[in-house]
Amino acid sequence: MKNVFFVLLVAFSVFRCAVRPESKNTPAFQVSFPAEVGGQPQDGRLILLLSTNNKQEPRFQYNFGVDTQLGFGMDVDGMKPGQEIMVGDSAFGFPIRKISDIPPGEYYVQAIINRYETFKLKSGKTVKLPPDQGEGQHWNTKPGNFYSRPFKITIDSVMTEPIRVVMDQVIPPVKEPTDTKYVKHIKIQSKMLTEFWGQPTYLGAHVLLPEGFDSHPKSKYPLMIYHGHFPSDFGGFSTEPPPANMDTSDYSERFGIYGYNKIQAQEAYNFYKQWTSKNFPRFLVVEIQHANPYYDDSYAVNSQNIGPYGDAIMYELLPEIERQFRGIGEGWARFTYGGSTGGWEALAVQMFYPDDFNGCFAACPDPIDFRSLCLVDIYKDKNAFWYDSEFKKLPRPSHRNYLGQIQATMEENNHYELVLGTKTRSGEQWDIWEAVYSPQGDDGYPKRIFNKETGEIDRSVANYWKENYDLRYILQRDWKSLGPKLQGKLHIYCGDMDNYYLNNAVYQMEAFLKTTKNPFYGGEVDYGDRAEHCWNGDHVNPNYLSRLRYNTMYLPKILKRIQESAPKGADIKSWRY
């Protein structure tokens, strides 16, 4: 009986071995950099990228949309020259979670390190962050970052050796813009921000001067701030028309038209002709550079994590601009406008500095009511990624087109960011909201509004957001004191098919504004039918044109506001030549 059992056991074991599937060799990558590009140990986010084509480098094909390629990220501390770092399944990936799940095939591979510096904050905390290097906080174009040239590889089940990737290239410095007759550039060291960050920190701006600035030395000018993402130079203004034979074969996927580069160039020249025309009102237009270690923009408010950018802009930068370029320097003569991030900023600075501005024009603003943080109610929902349901698991969308077709979900958006950086360091949209709005955590980094992997919302952080940055809530809470200072100053615009669902928060803001009394808000909320991001109030022209005309489209309303509200004796004539 024992011998029979032994024979059966051996036979069963042989059978098991025969049917066992062939083990898969997991692809792995060893990434390094030579001493020639950096002689010191490096801290940062190491990002491995793979693409199935070579139309562009993999670092330029990575995003959260349906056309994204593959990315995997991991933190490195003290990575030494020549040291090979193994990038395997411990790296966080999107849209494929693990390197071992990459399908067999041919790929182009590239690695890059977004290098961190150590900051000793005023709060006493020490953090490691990627400083802006003049590029506007972009990991894939940041000067000083090391990267490798792409090369072709094959991933298959018989791989036995790791693929070696050497980051032997360095992204070069950004060229500073030069002054012209009409566009000037200014940079100051901010005392407030330097104290906060523990090292010299600067604010910059591009200033568009009015026609006749030099020939009217006694004139002083109203000022308009055009808020938005990081401007490398003053955009949309050109003293030269585009060449008549300019290539128009370029295709804009966003707007579905060919030749958009020429359209933009023509609009820039048209703006110059209008700006310098006879009897055109003379203003200063300012675009601010306030990139920081968390994003290309500070949101122009004070923040526990980013610093007192609101006060630094208001009380350090603007006075210097108005001193150098003869601004009137009074609240009745300042206006602010912008779209998307710039729309939120325009409304926020008007609210937080109500006497210092005489009107805001906020187009497609980032969420201005956190009951609609896109499609998340941070006060009631339990999870940012999934709708609350006992049995059904339905993902929350984060991006759509004008027909409502979903192109990304909340989970995808945030997992994409998590590849680029932990601890709110991706330099992307959801992380900057967290960096601006959240309290500082015990480790010196922003407290998470929700778990970046699972989506679970932290209600205590949500309450902090509410009291400090929920613009609708703050207006409603403080209308008794704010209302008299904001009457007639609030103008909000949004497409009703905004790609990021920003119209939902605008609906909620409008519902409150309609109820205001003592005083009634006396402003404007308007919507573009079937209009996507970022509709700005133009019912006549298509979005691809109106988005290029911010610096002129609100002028009639601004001039009317000045006529109605300028104090007695104010200078409303010297700049009308």
Task: Give the location of each predicted region.
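Bacterial Sec-dependent N-terminal signal peptides
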Residues: M1-P27
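N-terminal processing/targeting junctions
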Residues: F12-F15, A28, D214-H216, Y315
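Contiguous beta-strand segments within globular domains
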Residues: K24-F33, G39-I47, P200-H206, I225
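Non-catalytic cap/lid and distal C-terminal segments of serine-dependent acyl enzymes
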Residues: T52-F92, R97-Y577
